[in-house]
């Protein structure tokens, strides 16, 4: 039986080359190679690699780099920015990225990150996801109602 981990994050150490947005209470690094070694150790065949928003925000370049190094092990998901008026183009470009299998919306209820569930940027994302046949992964800690409202408005979104 093939075993796929439905969500992993891998990341490089915080360096000027690829600086972190925040410094969480995580290990200093869990690189793509280290993730593959850990997966091998426990018998995981593949994983959905979600670019770590807390570290890299909307820059999924590290996820792309890791997927290219391990194309048979990782599929990738990119957080997208509801405030970007060109988010539809971002999603179209992402769809053409080898290994891309979805996009992510951050809908947590945290200071400075609250988002109104009727935000037009969320609607742009949902419409583009349907158009480009990309599933939407939502993080909605403490804000499940916002996620439900978005789903209700866009029932064709996966």
Language-model-detected regions and their locations in the chain:
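Acidic-and-aromatic substrate-binding clefts and catalytic sites of carbohydrate-active enzymes
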Residues: 51-58, 80-88, 111-117, 140-145
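Conserved, mostly hydrophobic/aromatic
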Residues: 7, 39, 63-66, 94, ...
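Catalytic pocket-lining loop regions of alpha/beta-barrel enzymes
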Residues: 115-158
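Hydrophobic faces of well-ordered beta-strands that scaffold small-molecule active sites
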Residues: 4-8, 46-51, 75-78, 101-105, ...
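An N-terminally biased module of ancient metal coordination in phosphate/nucleic-acid-related enzymes
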Residues: 1-58
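Metal-cofactor-binding active-site regions of metalloenzymes
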Residues: 44-51, 58, 65-83
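Glycine-rich phosphate-binding "P-loop"
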Residues: 19-29, 101-117
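Short, acidic/polar
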Residues: 28-39, 84-96
């Amino acid at each position: 039986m093939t075993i796929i981990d439905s969500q992993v994050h891998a990341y490089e150490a915080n360096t000027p080359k690829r600086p972190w947005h925040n410094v969480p209470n995580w290990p200093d690094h869990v690189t793509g190679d280290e993730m593959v070694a850990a997966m091998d150790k426990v018998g995981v065949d593949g994983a959905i690699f979600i670019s770590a928003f807390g570290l890299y925000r909307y820059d999924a370049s590290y996820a792309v780099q890791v997927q290219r190094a391990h194309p048979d092990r990782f599929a990738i998901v990119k957080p997208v920015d509801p405030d970007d008026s060109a988010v539809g183009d971002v999603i179209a470009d992402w769809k053409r990225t080898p290994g891309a299998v979805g996009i992510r919306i951050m809908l947590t209820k945290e200071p400075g990150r609250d988002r109104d569930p009727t935000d037009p940027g969320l609607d742009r994302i949902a419409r583009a996801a349907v158009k480009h046949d990309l599933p939407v992964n939502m993080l909605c800690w403490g804000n499940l109602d916002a996620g439900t409202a978005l789903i209700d408005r866009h029932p064709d979104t996966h």
